[in-house]
Regions:
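Alpha-helical transmembrane segments within multi-pass membrane transporters and channels
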Residues: 74-76
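Glycine/charged-rich beta-loop-alpha catalytic/anionic-binding loops adjacent to active sites
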Residues: 35-46, 91-94, 242-252
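Ribokinase/PfkB-type carbohydrate-kinase core domain
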Residues: 1-23, 84-100, 111-245, 303-307, ...
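Conserved post-catalytic alpha-helical subdomain immediately downstream of the catalytic base
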Residues: 221-225, 230, 249-315
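Glycine-rich phosphate/adenosyl-contacting loop at the front of the ribokinase-like
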Residues: 1-70, 81-82
Length: 316
């Protein structure tokens, strides 16, 4: 399967991340102290805030890599403080970020991580009204975007945008992330009827296949492309049902794993933009993910397009 998009429409959330670090491991804590019904009290060794949200992270990655990118999202008034200019400086088209003047704050994501890359995430969508967003098909028509990515958001919003893209003939990635548990059998079947590519980590796709009452192989038969990430191990790539495993690119150091999955997606889309096949694109995705975890902020990593493409040579 070969696809070469010329401009990417990223539909997804914008958030300010609150990142907390527990020195040690969650597993060691659980082995030492009885954890009942998720009740735990942990010391925090580091706390900081940074730009985030899956939509913002992926758009940042694409813009940084030189891929023409349009962001379709909504935000509170605080988006104009620094976040908007930050994305524009990284070549992201923010003309279709709807700012709700009645909402002071954009979404918030609180992530508690340990020293081994494990995370507990809470997402607050904020009060900005998603109904203020432009229709995805109209954005594609106005901007020339010819491939979409639907990042994790409320099921009703994702389904609306999927319908708009499908009716306009724009292929897209369905990436429900932490929202997958809010879907049901019927909604997922409707989403899959649009023949999207499906991205998710092991847990997310386990939830998806459980809701659909199928296994991963059956999901791969229903979707032209399925990418199942496995953290530091790598990823499973299914293309028209055929499976291959792509080893992860090892990171030189681990500063923070937050947003590494979003960076991987940007790397995959970068590869497709440059006319690479899915295997090569997936390999580039692991390189970008590794670069991401070497930096503290999910929108702090950098790598040039030439440098990234050059990493394919020692891999082949």
């Amino acid at each position: 399967m070969q696809i070469r998009p010329t401009k990417i429409l990223v539909c997804g959330s914008l958030a300010v991340d609150h990142l907390l670090r527990h020195s040690g491991s969650f597993k060691a804590y659980q082995e030492t102290y009885e954890v009942e019904a998720m009740n735990a009290s942990l010391p925090i060794s580091d706390y900081r805030t940074c730009f985030g949200g899956c939509g913002g992270n992926i758009a940042y990655g694409l813009g940084t890599l030189g891929v023409p990118t349009v962001l379709l999202s909504h935000a509170g008034r605080d988006f104009g403080d620094r976040y908007e200019q930050h994305l524009i400086q990284h070549d992201v088209d923010c003309a279709f970020v709807a700012v709700d003047q009645n909402a002071e704050f954009s979404a918030r994501c609180t992530i508690l991580g340990d020293d081994f890359g494990n995370q507990i995430t809470g997402f607050y969508p904020g009060h900005a009204d998603p109904k203020l967003r432009s229709a995805a098909n109209r954005v594609c028509e106005q901007t020339g975007a010819d491939f979409g990515l639907l990042g994790p958001e409320a099921p009703e919003l994702m389904l609306k945008q999927a319908t708009e893209l499908h009716q306009f003939g724009v292929p897209f990635i369905f990436d429900p992330g932490q929202w997958i548990s809010e879907f049901n059998h019927s909604l997922l079947n409707t989403m899959l009827s649009f023949d999207p590519w499906v991205f998710g980590n092991e847990h997310e796709l386990d939830v998806m296949t459980t809701l659909l009452e199928i296994d991963i192989a059956a999901l791969a038969e229903r979707s032209p492309v399925v990418v199942r990430t496995q953290g530091a191990r790598g990823l499973d790539l299914y293309v028209e049902g055929a499976h291959q495993f792509i080893n992860a690119e090892p990171a030189k150091t681990i500063a923070d794993t937050t947003g590494s999955g979003d960076a991987l997606r940007a790397g995959v889309l970068f590869g497709l933009y440059h006319g690479l096949d899915l295997t090569q694109a997936a390999r580039l995705g692991t390189v970008v993910a590794a670069r991401s975890v070497e930096h503290m902020d999910p929108q702090g990593w950098t790598i040039s397009a030439d440098e990234l493409l050059a990493t394919l040579n020692p891999m082949n």
